[in-house]
C-alpha cells in the first residue's frame, strides 16, 4: 500500500473518533486551574533538563536542540501554560485542531508579546512584528490535500510532507498566496506499515525535487523512531536519517542549502535521538501528561 493510500485509510478510520473527541473537550478553552498549570510548568522544566543532559552527554552545544511541544488534544489554556513555562515551538497533529485553537492562541499570545506562526503576518505592522517574540507553529501530523488551505494561513512549517504529490499541492497553494512555506520531508526509517513517510531509499531524490519547488523552503527531515525496545534499532533509524540529511546538503542541489533540521525523538526516545544528531524533539506526554483521548 502506498503512503497516500495508507494515509487515506487512516483518515477514514480516525474521522469518527476525531468528531467524538472534539465533542468531549473544548479545545478553545483558555482557562485552566493553577494546579494544572503548575503540572505543565514542571513538565516543561523536566524535559528541558533532560535535553540539556542529553546534549552534554553527546558532547553537543547547549541549546542545539529545540523542544517542540506536541499539543495534540491539549486546549488553548494548556498550551499557554507551556509557553509561559518556556516552550518556544508548538506542533499540532491535526489540521482540525489548528482551526479550533489558532485564533484564541494568537490573541492571548499577542497580549503576552508573542506572535504565533504566520497568523498575524498579513496584518502586523513592521514595528509590532519586530517587537514580538515569534512562536513557530508546525504541523507534525498527516495533511490531506483538502486541508492545505486551512493550515497555510497559520503554520510556518509542515513536517509531514512525504510525497511529491503532496509537496506540489502545498507549493501551488503557497504560490497562489504569495508565501513560502517551510517543509520537512518525512521519512519512514523504521519501515513500519503503521507509519507514514517516504521510503529511506527515495529520500534524497524527493528532497532534491522538493527543494527546487517554488513556494516551499526545504528545512530538513523528520522521522518517528522505531516502536521497539531494542536501542540499537532505534538509534540506527536516527543515524540513517542524519546521514541522509548530510548527503542532501553535500549534493549542493538547488534549494537544499537550508535542509539542516532533523526532527526526531519523542518522550520515550529523545536521548537516543539527541545523541544521533536531532535538532528538534517533539514531546507531548512528558510535558502535559498522558492523553485522555487518542
Feature-to-residue mapping (PLM):
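Conserved alpha/beta-domain cores
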Residues: 19-268, 274-276, 288-290
Amino acid at each position: 500500500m502506498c503512503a497516500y493510500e495508507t494515509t487515506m485509510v487512516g483518515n477514514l478510520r480516525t474521522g469518527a473518533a476525531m468528531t467524538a473527541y472534539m465533542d468531549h473537550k473544548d479545545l478553545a478553552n483558555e482557562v485552566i486551574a493553577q494546579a494544572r498549570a503548575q503540572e505543565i510548568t514542571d513538565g516543561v522544566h523536566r524535559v528541558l533538563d533532560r535535553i540539556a543532559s542529553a546534549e552534554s552527554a553527546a558532547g553537543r552545544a547547549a541549546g542545539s536542540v529545540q523542544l517542540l511541544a506536541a499539543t495534540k488534544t491539549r486546549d488553548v489554556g494548556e498550551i499557554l501554560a507551556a509557553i509561559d513555562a518556556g516552550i518556544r515551538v508548538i506542533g499540532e497533529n491535526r489540521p482540525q485542531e489548528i482551526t479550533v485553537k489558532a485564533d484564541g492562541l494568537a490573541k492571548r499570545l499577542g497580549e503576552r508579546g508573542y506572535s504565533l506562526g504566520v497568523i498575524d503576518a498579513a496584518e502586523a505592522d513592521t514595528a509590532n512584528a519586530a517587537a514580538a517574540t515569534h512562536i513557530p507553529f508546525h504541523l507534525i501530523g498527516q495533511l490531506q490535500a483538502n486541508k492545505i488551505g486551512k493550515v497555510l494561513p497559520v503554520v510556518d512549517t509542515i513536517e509531514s510532507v512525504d510525497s511529491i504529490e503532496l509537496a506540489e499541492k502545498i507549493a501551488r497553494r503557497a504560490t497562489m498566496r504569495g508565501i513560502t512555506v517551510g517543509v520537512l520531508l518525512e521519512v519512514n526509517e523504521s519501515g513500519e506499515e503503521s507509519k507514514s513517510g517516504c521510503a529511506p531509499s527515495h529520500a534524497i531524490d524527493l528532497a532534491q525535487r522538493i527543494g527546487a519547488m517554488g513556494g516551499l523552503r526545504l528545512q530538513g527531515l523528520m522521522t518517528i523512531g522505531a516502536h521497539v525496545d531494542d536501542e540499537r534499532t532505534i538509534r540506527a533509524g536516527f543515524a540513517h536519517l542524519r546521514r541522509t540529511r548530510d548527503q542532501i546538503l553535500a549534493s549542493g542541489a538547488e534549494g537544499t542549502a537550508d535542509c539542516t533540521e532533523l526532527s526526531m525523538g519523542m518522550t520515550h526516545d529523545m536521548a537516543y535521538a539527541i545523541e544521533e544528531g536531532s535538532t528538534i524533539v517533539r514531546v507531548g506526554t512528558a510535558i502535559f501528561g498522558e492523553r485522555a483521548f487518542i
